[in-house]
């Protein structure tokens, strides 16, 4: 993802599959729903796979057209690999989205991506943070469920 259009840098060897529904993903992967209900902190269940699936599913639902495509970024270097979960394109701008199942940590991949793409003004970190939006430099921290709120990710993208 060196710039727009993102299709120019797509590799057919690297894909990131998403199911149509979180429930279908759980079934195919053999995830027992009762195991999920036993946990107080659902965000850490199955190493964040459910959280990433949920956010991806919501982004696809928000795409609103047949031409909407989901992208992600990965860099594979011998000493340092990095990955951004989703790249969302709105009004000719790229918005990187990182999904974290627990605390946001150092966000190494996001910082690498932003350093390589200084023209990007806003990046999103979706995690189990409190409802209040938190802004740190170019990063906006939002809770998973913000997608359903009219002040959430969709309205944030629409404001650009």
Protein language model features and the residues they cover:
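Active-site-adjacent loop/helix micro-motif of nuclease/hydrolase catalytic cores
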Residues: 103-112, 134
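Conserved N-terminal glycine/acidic-rich loop preference
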Residues: 84, 90-96, 133-141
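Short beta-alpha junction loops
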Residues: 76, 127-132
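Short, hydrophobic beta-strand segments that form beta-sheet elements in well-ordered domains
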Residues: 121-127
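Accessory nucleic acid-recognition modules appended to NTPase machines
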Residues: 1-83, 88-91
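Active-site ExK catalytic segment of metal-dependent nucleases
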Residues: 94-104
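Domain-level recognition of nuclease-like catalytic cores that cleave nucleotide substrates
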Residues: 130-160
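Arginine/glycine-rich "motif VI" loop of SF2 helicases in the C-terminal RecA-like domain
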Residues: 62-65, 112-121
């Amino acid at each position: 993802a060196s710039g727009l259009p993102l299709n120019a840098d797509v590799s057919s060897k690297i894909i990131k599959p998403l199911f149509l529904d979180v429930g279908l993903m759980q079934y195919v992967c053999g995830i027992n729903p009762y195991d999920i209900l036993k946990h107080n902190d659902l965000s850490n269940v199955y190493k964040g796979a459910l959280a990433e699936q949920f956010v991806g599913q919501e982004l696809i639902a928000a795409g609103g057209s047949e031409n909407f495509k989901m992208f992600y970024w990965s860099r594979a270097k011998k000493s340092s690999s990095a990955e951004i979960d989703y790249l969302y394109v709105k009004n000719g701008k790229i918005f990187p989205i990182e999904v974290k199942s627990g605390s946001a940590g150092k966000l190494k991949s996001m910082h690498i991506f932003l350093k390589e793409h200084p023209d990007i003004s806003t990046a999103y970190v979706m995690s189990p943070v409190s409802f209040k939006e938190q802004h740190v430099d170019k990063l906006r921290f939002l809770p998973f469920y913000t997608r359903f709120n009219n002040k959430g990710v969709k309205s944030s993208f629409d404001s650009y």
